[in-house]
Amino acid sequence: MKPKFLFVTLLLCLLGGCSDYPAEKGLTKARLEHKQGRALYNINGKLFVPILYSPPFSISRSPYGEDGRINYSNFRDAGIDLVEMHMELRNAWNRDGTLNIPMVRHELISVLEGILEINPDAYFQVRVDFHAPRWWLDRYPAEMVHYARGPIDFGTTNDIGRAPNASLASERWQQEADVIVKQFLDYLQTTRVGKRVFSFLIGGACGSEWTYFGYKQEPDTGDAMTRRFRQWLADKYVTDVALQQAWNDPRVTIATAVVPDMEERRYNLGVFRDPQKERRILDYYHCHQETIESVINHFTQFFKENWPSDVLVGLFNGYLFSDNDFNSTGYLYFGRLLDSPYIDFFAGPYNYNYDARDAGGTSQPRSLVGSVNLHGKLFMTEQDRITHLIAQSRNNETTFTTDEQSVAMLRTNFAQLVSLASGYWFEEFSGFPGYAPYVAHEPLQEYAGNFNSPALMSEIGRQKRYYDQAVHHDYEREADVAFFYDFDTFYYLAEVDNRQTREIEYASNNWLTADAYRSGVSFDTYLYSDLRKVDLSRYKAVVFGTTYCISDEDMVFINDQVKKDGRLVIFNYAPAYTDGTKLDVRRIGKITEMEVRPIKITTPPVMTILGNHYGLEADGSPGRVPVSPLFEIDDAGVEVLGRYQGSDAVAVARKKQPDYTVVYAALPLRGPGMMRKLFREAGAHIYNDADDVVIAGGGIVCVATREDAGGPRTIHLRNGKQVELDMKPGTTVILDEHTGEILFD
């Protein structure tokens, strides 16, 4: 053991062996229980649907003011007894390594005590962050994260910027954080409110979401990560000779290797990194991602093993949909976390694409919920869409102005929960930094609250009562289409300051599924690494999204086991372009069974499909740059479905075989109409022929119209029944999937 960590280990052992706060009997026992296809909370032997209220960052946090009292009472009256609260342990981390008990009482215990006064039946999920405090960073500067874009900015606390923070590679930080977390858990379990804790949400890094500190600043070039990177290289390559051969650098050694700088990260002429020339970059990002995974594994296990009762443990992770700097954030090892015995649930907000958050939007969760369910975990959505009760919106969200708009949005959110057998918490934004606490529209609220209106709370109560009953019936998820996305692919994409990569990623990760929601079909989303685990016999169509890294072995499996049974198989952009060792356009042709060749287009590429034009829109603006590599289909044996605008070059084509059909889109496929046509011809059920959002499964069918769309709708149920609706613009209707009865309108 390293001497400098000896005192930490001794202190931890002392705390574990003879705590000053012996555990009080009667701690809550909680676990996930899978009932009739859904994951529910079993809390002290009673089942709860996974719906919570979460106000820790708002003006409503304190139950002792009127804002808090009213909102806690609202959710109590709506039948929601589960509440999330936050504790930032760096605020209670004393310089001598002990826990500041009065600060914990002030920031957490007294708040929970006040909530219990309002709702004696409340149980608590505690979100815990344990960032290093500033005094710790000053004491141990060699343990800090550094950024390739520039020096640490000691004047900012914005964790997306170059703020001072402990490196996730720091062994000292991890060991000393263990000590403070252990003291916190030991103390919490002695309190009256600690007996009501059923779950811990383990927060980490930027925004509690396990995105690496300063991920847009290209971390981590600091000493701690450099040490870890060298150890990682030693484990992988063993000898300097092997490293030199892999990196094509006769001068490098394991002992002198450093984290790549900005020039190395930024240098690239196209969308892809060449694994034969840029192995150093690929190696660092693998080390970076493994570091985050290691820290998560450590702390989730630590919480499980140091809480003397059964307790749920989860974290934010697995973000795909929306916008992300995938290499530098921290989710590329999500597939391995899904197998962790110490993680019960994963969480994330809704997709930030405006088609998800606009009026009439999809409310798409950011993660691949199909894989979460497949692995027996629970997915919890942070229901953070802004209602009309907050004066300003954020990102791409519509600024709602009426109860009716907000109710429609809440219904779409709820439909996602029911159809995916997931859960969520209602995130409170009133008084959140940057968000005005009161409405900007007349009449003003007397008290703050993102949901504090009779209409919204009535809707929330109705939804809760419905779901309390729905979970007693078998869960049915009759999706006909499966989408697969590959996190390993992102290692081979040159993301740093590269607009063309950004546009390809955005189209594949966002618009592909956004248009699928409006095609009228029900679909599931999975990790590509789960391809062999999924029961493919359920699906009429399989869509490979961002899956550009496919091994020879996987290609055989796809050709033998996916392309069969009359199934439609759709590939996008550059499927199998790399196997992890090289880039080869011939592999695209091999998997698509079409003649594919590179094409050079000197303007931002646009596809024309069914008379509509689709470019690579990102950040709310059209495609700005040419893309390289770009491909065309040069095959006389295909059916042409789309061309590049202003050219005869084929961009989308279909090839029918006796037992399956392949579609290849050389840019990520777009167009609800084209998808509807392809899915219908493959035998998938189409609920609605209008371009409305359709969410189906779990006993419901949801239809949501845009603000500029409405009118007569014919909804086709799977049992042959038809339901005629006259829908207003910007509204959401939820039907019973079997009877067609209107449940929410």
PLM feature segments, named:
Residues 309, 314-511, 600-628, 639-643, ...:
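Hydrophobic targeting/anchoring helices
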Residues 16-17:
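C-terminal motif of bacterial Sec signal peptides marking the signal peptidase cleavage site
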